[in-house]
Amino acid sequence: RFIVEFDALTCLVQHEYYHRYTADVHTLNAIRELDRIYTEAEPITLKYRAALHETTDSSLLYLTLLLHDIGKAEGIRGHSDSGVRLATPLLERFGVKPADRELVLFVIKNHLAMARFWQKRDVDDPQTAAAFAELVGNAEQLRNLYVHTFCDARGTAVSLWNSYKDTLHTSLYRATLERLSLGDGVAASYEKKKQMTQQELIARKILGVSAEEIA
């Protein structure tokens, strides 16, 4: 046995209503979703494949997905934090280099964060991207979290992931990536786009809507 810590997930029932599988089967399903990104031509997977190609080592996501729910052995509450604690010595035992270890542990700790952001916040608000950029820190961690969230959700139940959720998820990803790339320049870019949109609407002279209302 290479990962004795995984034993506690075997046949572990997850009582949240959206979970259809035991923790061990869910983990394997999530890994299978990552395989599909590489091997299938399903349109929804193409942007995730592109994001993977931009990562330093896309194979690390297999390890991250394998370990992301390992903390559930100690209970669902706080399982992200307990997962980090359990995974840390395991990664050291496997000889994973420090930089890669840090990346894997970051995603384990924050593997629920991205979905919560786009579920609870306006992804079109620049402040949402700014706040998420502050959380993820850099593009490498963002790309890994972006793909991981997709695989994790589809590994729970493919039917739970629809085009609406995918649009919100990808909108947050792209806005955050832009924020990380341009920094404070994003605010100026957003304001410029806003002004251009306002000018276009004013030029159309929409019946019953004044220029002041548009502005």
What is the role of each PLM region?
Residues 1-79, 89, 95:
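Acidic/His-rich, divalent-metal-binding segments that scaffold phosphate/diphosphate chemistry
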Residues 5-13, 62-67, 82-88, 111-112, ...:
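Short acidic (Asp/Glu) and glycine-rich catalytic loops that position anionic groups and cofactors
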Residues 16-23, 56, 60, 73-77, ...:
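Hydrophobic alpha-helical scaffolding
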Residues 30, 83, 108:
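Divalent metal-coordination and catalytic microenvironments
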Residues 36, 72, 76, 89-96, ...:
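Short, well-ordered loop/turn and helix-capping segments at boundaries between secondary-structure elements
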Residues 80-87, 101, 105:
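Amphipathic alpha-helical segments in well-structured domains
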Residues 92-150:
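Acidic/histidine-rich catalytic neighborhood
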Residues 127, 131-215:
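Regulatory modules associated with amino-acid/nitrogen control
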